[in-house]
Swiss-Prot record:
It comes from Yersinia pseudotuberculosis serotype O:3 (strain YPIII). It catalyses: guanosine(1516) in 16S rRNA + S-adenosyl-L-methionine = N(2)-methylguanosine(1516) in 16S rRNA + S-adenosyl-L-homocysteine + H(+). The gene is rsmJ. The keyword rRNA processing applies. GO terms for molecular function: rRNA (guanine-N2-)-methyltransferase activity. Disulfide bonds: none annotated. This is Ribosomal RNA small subunit methyltransferase J. Pfam families: SAM_MT (PF04445). Belongs to the methyltransferase superfamily. RsmJ family.
Length: 256
């Protein structure tokens, strides 16, 4: 396992031994000079940009906040991502989210009833996801179904997509895409997140293995101004105000 250097901090009230366990599990090496910090608080794990403290911490929260509001009051099956993966009455596809990020769309699909496996290659992001899942699994309201439907695999999609079994009906891709200079007021969360992971410059290499794994379709989320992934025109798209969900058919030959 290659190691990632990041400042590791523990606040008052946090389990004093948890930080070293976290570092060992995810292959993290503490660097006091690093701009990015992974902070263990009494409640959760947070990512912070030390030179911009006003941005606050980034963390995964499936129980409260925007995710809970989206689950309770969002568009449900009418949400663009739900339409794009093909959810309809009597059909809930199994989904591999191959670029999980902070798990937002994966959680929406799981809340609607899909079995979703998240893949995340960055160990810091995987640690944040794992912490959010751990807290979510313990929640009395969402824990029982979350444990059944939403799981995490820390691996690179470029290699893992070849080996996943059983094959999902849908592979979902949402690679990090550079923001246009005009949109300087990128949400604070994205500024912190992009400082850590940067752009997914190898994302074009995901489309072919994703289409070879999915038995039905691949869905690629793109900003409205972005070209298609790998320059391959989509078969269809679900379009929102600022994004589109490009849809590609599986390249798997169905059995005769």
């Amino acid at each position: 396992m290659s190691h990632v250097s990041i400042c590791l901090l523990s606040e008052a009230g946090a389990d004093p031994g948890a930080l070293s366990i976290l570092a060992d599990r995810w292959g993290l090496v503490s660097d006091d000079q690093a701009v990015m910090a992974l902070v263990l608080t009494a409640e959760r794990l947070e990512l912070r940009k030390r030179d911009e403290p006003k941005l606050g911490g980034i963390y995964v929260d499936f129980v409260s906040g925007t995710q809970a509001h989206r689950r309770k009051f969002g568009g449900g099956r009418g949400e663009a991502v739900a339409k794009a993966v093909g959810i309809k009455k009597g059909y809930l596809p199994r989904v591999v989210d191959a670029t999980a990020g902070l798990g937002r769309d994966a959680f929406v699909l799981a809340a609607l009833g899909c079995q979703v496996q998240m893949l995340e290659r960055n160990p810091v992001v995987a640690a944040l996801l794992d912490d959010g899942l751990r807290r979510g699994y313990l929640d009395a309201e969402i824990g029982p179904w979350l444990r059944e439907r939403l799981t995490l695999l820390h691996a690179s999609s470029l290699t893992a997509l070849v080996a996943i079994e059983p094959c999902p009906e849908v592979v979902y891709l949402d690679p990090m895409y550079p923001h246009r200079q005009k949109s300087a007021l990128v949400k604070k969360e994205m500024r912190v997140f992009q400082s850590l992971v940067g752009a997914d410059n190898d994302a074009d290499g995901l489309l072919a293995p994703a289409r070879a794994l999915a038995t039905k379709r691949v869905v690629v989320k793109r900003p409205d101004y972005a070209e298609p992934l790998a320059g391959v025109a989509a078969q269809a798209a679900v379009v929102t105000k600022s994004h589109r969900f490009d849809i590609y058919p599986s390249s798997v030959t169905p059995p005769r």
